[in-house]
Amino acid sequence: MPSSGALKDLSFSQHFRMMVICIVLLQVLLQAVSVAVTYMYFTNEMKQLQDNYSKIGLACFSKTDEDFWDSTDGEILNRPCLQVKRQLYQLIEEVTLRTFQDTISTVPEKQLSTPPLPRGGRPQKVAAHITGITRRSNSALIPISKDGKTLGQKIESWESSRKGHSFLNHVLFRNGELVIEQEGLYYIYSQTYFRFQEAEDASKMVSKDKVRTKQLVQYIYKYTSYPDPIVLMKSARNSCWSRDAEYGLYSIYQGGLFELKKNDRIFVSVTNEHLMDLDQEASFFGAFLIN
């Protein structure tokens, strides 16, 4: 049988072992609690930072930054708002460029071909702008509506030389018409200015409350190889002048894109041509090549 001293040593050893195990378990438990608390703390902090960053990003796009485009790299690094905008614009540029490249790759090479450049390597500027010029007689406006194919009276009183605002670049001018030399898509425009002044004799024949009505119409025509002119645009308005008014001023402007061939001719005609004011700033006609 074991002695009493041996039993005491065995009991002490068991108690010591149990104490060590408890201490180890307690340390593991404390570490687990510490890790859990730390994880929850950092998760909460990250969520708050994410929410704040999202709010800052939304605030960046809800207000305008006028100096964004002029900002340097150093200023952008110091301003989170500008960083967000720059990243977004870079993403938009990448997507746009990728889409453009995909689109270009599907277009036949024939459509992508460009006309040869003239000598010097610079593209020609094809454009014309002619302005009104005070007419010496009524012969400057030629009636052209007798055949029923055109309306109004053709304006020939255009200043075609390089005086004032007028110029011609690779477009000819002949008999009040602009003659196209290069085929392509053109923007054509015209403005006509009307000035009405009641004659004293006529005003006596009209009652005080009565007004005189004039129908003002502007036409832009095109001549092609086809014998009859083709109307491209027209604009109209009914204008009333009061008997008590010293004079009335009205203008008509119109413009549009049209495909023109070589040797096509375009011109302007109007109704009530005797009311036109052919000042260069008031009445003008022109066209320029888009592509």
UniProtKB/Swiss-Prot annotation:
The record's comment on protein family reads: Belongs to the tumor necrosis factor family.
* Keyword Secreted attributed: yes
Ranges in the topological domain labelled Extracellular:
39-291
Where does it live in the cell? Cell membrane; Secreted
How the protein assembles, per its UniProt entry?
Answer: Homotrimer. One TNFSF10 homotrimer interacts with three TNFSF10A mononers. One TNFSF10 homotrimer interacts with three TNFSF10B mononers.
The processes (GO biological process) annotated in the record are: immune response; positive regulation of canonical NF-kappaB signal transduction; positive regulation of extrinsic apoptotic signaling pathway; positive regulation of release of cytochrome c from mitochondria; TRAIL-activated apoptotic signaling pathway
Which tissues is this protein detected in according to the database?
Widespread.
Organism name? Mus musculus
Q: Where do the THD domain residues begin and end?
A: 126-290
Topology versus the membrane, per the UniProt entry?
A: Single-pass type II membrane protein
**Keyword rRNA-binding: yes or no?**
no
Q: What is this protein called?
A: Tumor necrosis factor ligand superfamily member 10
Q: Which InterPro entries match?
A: TNF_CS, TNF_dom, TNF_ligand_10/11, Tumour_necrosis_fac-like_dom
Record topological domains on the Cytoplasmic side: 1-17
One MF term in GO for this entry? Answer: tumor necrosis factor receptor binding
Would you list which residues are glycosylated?
N52
Tell me, in a sentence or two, what this protein's role is: Cytokine that binds to TNFRSF10A/TRAILR1, TNFRSF10B/TRAILR2, TNFRSF10C/TRAILR3, TNFRSF10D/TRAILR4 and possibly also to TNFRSF11B/OPG. Induces apoptosis. Its activity may be modulated by binding to the decoy receptors TNFRSF10C/TRAILR3, TNFRSF10D/TRAILR4 and TNFRSF11B/OPG that cannot induce apoptosis.
Give the CC-aspect GO terms: extracellular space; plasma membrane
PROSITE patterns, per database record: THD_1, THD_2
User: What Pfam families does the entry give?
Assistant: TNF
Question: In what way is this protein post-translationally modified?
Answer: Tyrosine phosphorylated by PKDCC/VLK.
Query: For binding Zn(2+), which residues are annotated in this chain's numbering?
Result: C240
Transmembrane ranges, per UniProt, are: 18-38
Query: Which keywords appear in this protein's UniProt record, sorted alphabetically?
Result: Apoptosis, Cell membrane, Cytokine, Glycoprotein, Membrane, Metal-binding, Phosphoprotein, Secreted, Signal-anchor, Transmembrane, Transmembrane helix, Zinc
